[in-house]
Amino acid sequence: MASYLDFEKNIQQIDEDIINAQIKGDTEAVSILKKNLEKEISKTYKNLSDFQRLQLARHPDRPYALDYIELILNDAHEIHGDRAFRDDPAIVCFMGYLGEKKIIVIGEQKGRGTKDKIARNFGMPHPEGYRKALRVARLAEKFQIPILFLIDTPGAYPGIGAEERGQSEAIARNLYELSDLKIPTIAIVIGEGGSGGALAIGVADKLVMMKNSVFSVISPEGCAAILWNDPAKSEAATKAMKVTADDLKSQGLIDDVIDEPTNGAHRNKEAAAVAIADYVKKSLNELENIDVRELSANRMQKILKLGAYQEA
C-alpha cells in the first residue's frame, strides 16, 4: 500500500477515488480522475518548500540503493564483508554492468519493513560498513572499474560499539583514501545525506543530488533542538540550514542536480532510475577521457575549497 505525506492528502484522495471507480468498472470516471490526478500532482510538486523536500527525501516509498541497483545494473553480483570484523548490511556493494560498461556500485541501504530496517540499522553504517566500502573501492581501483556511490543515510551509527571499533577513524580513512583513487568516481545523494555518514562515501569526481534529496551536517530536528531547544522548530531549521539540492548547487558544494519525475521518485522509481543511469553514463564518458592523475588532483582541489570563507 502506498504511503502519503501530509501535503499529499489530495493526491491520496484521488488515488482512492480511481481505485473505487475501477472496482465499479466506471471507465469514464477513471479517465476523468486520472486527468485530475495529473493536475493535482503538478500543482502539489510545483512549488515545494524546503521542509516538504526533506519529507520527500525520507518518504517511506522512496527508492533506496538496492532499488536503483536492481533497475540499472545488469549481471549484478554482491560483494560482502570488510575482511576484518563482519559484513555490515547498511552498506551494499555490487559489481555489474551499466549498459555495456562494467561498474561497481557502493550504497547505503535503509531497509524496508521492520526486520529489514533493524538488520540494516536504519541505514546507519558501523565502521565495518565503511571499511567494506573502502575494501571494494580499492578492488575497483585495482581492476580499473569506475565507482558509483549512492548516498542515503541519516548519519553514521553513533553507538558505543561503533565508537569502540573506530567510527571516526573509519570515516576519516575513507575521506583520505577515496580522495586519491585513480579511477573515475561519481557520488549521488538519493535521499538523505547525513553528515559524516554521507561524506564517508561522498568523495568523488562528481558529487550530485537528486532533486528531492537533502544534505546537511546535522538533521534539522537536531539543529532545532540545539539552537532553539525545540525540535518542533525543524521546519524553520530546514530553511535556515540550506539543505536542498538547489541550495547546495548555488553554493558550489555539489556539481549537479538530477531532476526527478514530476510526481517524485517515490511514485515513479523506473523514471528516476533512468535519470540516474543516463547521468552516470554521460559523466563516465567525460571522466574516462581525463587522466586519472588529473582526476585525483581535481578531486583534492574540490575538497580544499570546501569551507572557504571571507572575513567581513
From Swiss-Prot:
Domain CoA carboxyltransferase C-terminal, first and last residues per copy: 36-286
EC number(s) per entry: 2.1.3.15
NCBIfam families cross-referenced by the UniProt entry: accA, AccA_sub, PRK05724.1
Stated name of the protein: Acetyl-coenzyme A carboxylase carboxyl transferase subunit alpha
Coiled-coil region(s): none
GO CC terms: acetyl-CoA carboxylase complex
Organism for this UniProt entry: Campylobacter jejuni (strain RM1221)
UniProt keywords, alphabetically: ATP-binding, Cytoplasm, Fatty acid biosynthesis, Fatty acid metabolism, Lipid biosynthesis, Lipid metabolism, Nucleotide-binding, Transferase
GO MF, any single term: acetyl-CoA carboxylase activity
Catalytically driven reaction(s): N(6)-carboxybiotinyl-L-lysyl-[protein] + acetyl-CoA = N(6)-biotinyl-L-lysyl-[protein] + malonyl-CoA
InterPro entries for the chain: Acetyl_CoA_COase_a_su, ClpP/crotonase-like_dom_sf, COA_CT_C
Similarity remark: Belongs to the AccA family.
